[in-house]
Amino acid sequence: MTHPARKTLALRRDPRRLHMAWMITALVAASLVAFQAMAAGPGARSDARTLEVADTAGSCPSSLNVDMHKLQDESVQNLCQYAGKVLLVVNTASYCGYTRQYEGLEKLYGKYRNRGLVVLAFPSNDFGQEAADKSKIETLCFNTYGVKFPIFTPTPVTGNGANPLFRTLIKTTGQAPAWNFHKYLVDRNGQPVAAFPSNVEPEDPRLTREIERLLARPTT
């Protein structure tokens, strides 16, 4: 058996053997690095995906990071899908003197949707004028008025029980819905910027001028 000290001395005296030893060491080191990279690869890709998801979530204003239920099938809809749009948020009711505003809201949506306007309707019985049967709300909205903009299941819009979106709208604008068909405008950055009472019709110039102003502004 060769003594370790003699083996080292032999390597020093023979350059070829020394060069070969260094090559073997380098190959082993490279193999270890490659193995570590392969082992970390899926995790690294997973981390990248996680960062991408986090970035997407971060691009959604907190005011819109709310889950609501779609009227038609009660599927969960996160309002982040409307980030970057100008939003007209309205609390609605089926048995109100202003119910006919559904027609004007649909016209408004049809006129401006290609420029980035989305009307979001939230039926509510806070003022005692909404149908208890969801199917009746659907019939009124989709059959009677031919509504195509998003409508959600009945939800509270006033007081401590108001849904998270309306709590934000009320806090930011300082105006709570005093009646059905109160209207809030939200800019492309998710910031509530204006509120209009029920008697302001959807095609009222005061409302349409503000919509056009917001549509002309880019997301910042």
Regions from the language model: what does each represent?
Residues M1-R17:
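N-terminal secretory signal peptides that target proteins for export/translocation
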Residues G43-C80, R100:
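N-terminal "domain-start" segment that seeds a small globular fold
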Residues A83-L87, R113-V118, Y145-P150, N180, ...:
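Loop/turn elements at helix/coil->beta-strand transitions in domains of secreted/extracellular proteins
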Residues N91-Y95:
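Amphipathic alpha-helical repeat scaffolds
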Residues Y98-A162:
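Structural microenvironment flanking redox-active thiols in thiol-disulfide oxidoreductases
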Residues H3, E74-S75, Q191:
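Residue-level signal for well-ordered, solvent-exposed loop/turn and beta-edge residues enriched
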Residues P164-R167, K171-T220:
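Thiol-/selenol-based redox modules, centered on thioredoxin-like
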Residues W22-A34:
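Bacterial N-terminal signal peptides
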